[in-house]
UniProtKB/Swiss-Prot annotation:
One Pfam family here: Abhydrolase_1
Gene that this sequence comes from: bioH
Main location: cytoplasm
Active site: residue positions: 77, 192, 220
InterPro entries cross-referenced by the UniProt entry: AB_hydrolase_1 (IPR000073), AB_hydrolase_fold (IPR029058), AB_hydrolase_sf (IPR050266), BioH (IPR010076)
PANTHER family linked: AB HYDROLASE SUPERFAMILY PROTEIN YCLE (PTHR43798:SF31), MONOACYLGLYCEROL LIPASE (PTHR43798)
Subunit structure: Monomer.
UniProt protein name: Pimeloyl-[acyl-carrier protein] methyl ester esterase
GO MF annotation terms: pimelyl-[acyl-carrier protein] methyl ester esterase activity
Functional note: The physiological role of BioH is to remove the methyl group introduced by BioC when the pimeloyl moiety is complete. It allows to synthesize pimeloyl-ACP via the fatty acid synthetic pathway through the hydrolysis of the ester bonds of pimeloyl-ACP esters.
Residues binding substrate, per UniProt: 20, 77-78, 138-142, 220
Keywords: Biotin biosynthesis, Cytoplasm, Hydrolase, Serine esterase
Length: 239
């Protein structure tokens, strides 16, 4: 089973994982800013874009076979869970870990800020009815109505959406995160309703060796709403 990759530019390899409901096309607006310095490798996660459904172990093996020996890895939202798991399990391959409005655990519990699982279920139900309309409304909300021409090339499969929902609801790396010793940064948006800024305060206490960046006027998509700040942060972090 092949994993679909798109490559742009030359330089240090930078692998990008998209979020739930999207595919690697979500990164297209920032590629011109990144490709002068990096070899950008855009990945379609299982069940999204042109990558078929597969379990984690199959995904990891197939992906690592297609990637350079060492690379920086960035994941947005659900993609951050994939990126974190890969960094935990393959520390010799991942040189830098960048988590963009992501969390080691998305669902809230008594001592962890997050979102109620019903939020994702409602989003899933809306996606199942009208994918294009739901994603465009989601983007508009996160960008505070800023214009963004997003074209969905390959809608996610129902299986991909359901599998992603399961990942968001069950994957929990809060304990394993303590194993990570590579340079790691977490980016938060103060207006983000999905990864609340309260998460940042708890993570700063529990994982003091990581770097944390807060985008004061951003919501869940700072790489699109505040691209210049995002690119500056990436260039400062990846040496």
């Amino acid at each position: 089973m092949n994993i679909h990759l798109d490559k742009h530019g030359q330089g240090m390899p930078l692998v990008l994982f998209h979020g739930w409901g999207f595919d690697n096309q979500i990164w297209q607006p920032i590629i011109p800013y990144l490709k002068p310095k990096y070899q950008i490798i855009l990945v379609d996660l299982p069940g999204f874009g042109l990558t078929p459904m597969m379990d984690w172990e199959s995904f990891k093996k197939n992906l690592l076979d297609q990637l350079p020996d060492k690379f920086a890895l960035a994941g947005w939202s659900m993609g951050g869970l994939y990126a974190t798991r890969l960094a935990i399990e393959e520390p010799a391959r991942v040189q830098y870990l960048i988590n963009i409005t992501s969390s080691p655990r998305f669902i809230s519990d008594i001592d962890w800020p997050g979102v109620a699982e019903e939020v994702f279920v409602n989003f899933y139900n809306n996606l199942s009815k009208d994918i294009n309309k739901t994603l465009k409304e989601f983007i508009s909300l996160q960008l505070n109505k800023m214009k963004f021409d997003f074209k969905i090339g390959n809608p996610p499969s129902p299986e991909g959406l359901a599998f992603g929902l399961e990942i968001l609801g069950t994957w929990d790396f809060r304990e394993q995160l303590k194993q990570i010793t590579i340079p790691t940064v977490y980016l938060f948006g103060r207006l983000d309703p999905i990864t609340p800024v309260k998460t940042m305060a708890i993570m700063e206490k529990n994982y003091p060796n990581f770097k944390y960046v807060l985008f004061n006027r951003a919501a869940h998509m700072p790489f699109l709403s505040h691209t210049d700040l995002f690119i500056t942060m990436m260039d400062e972090f990846i040496k």
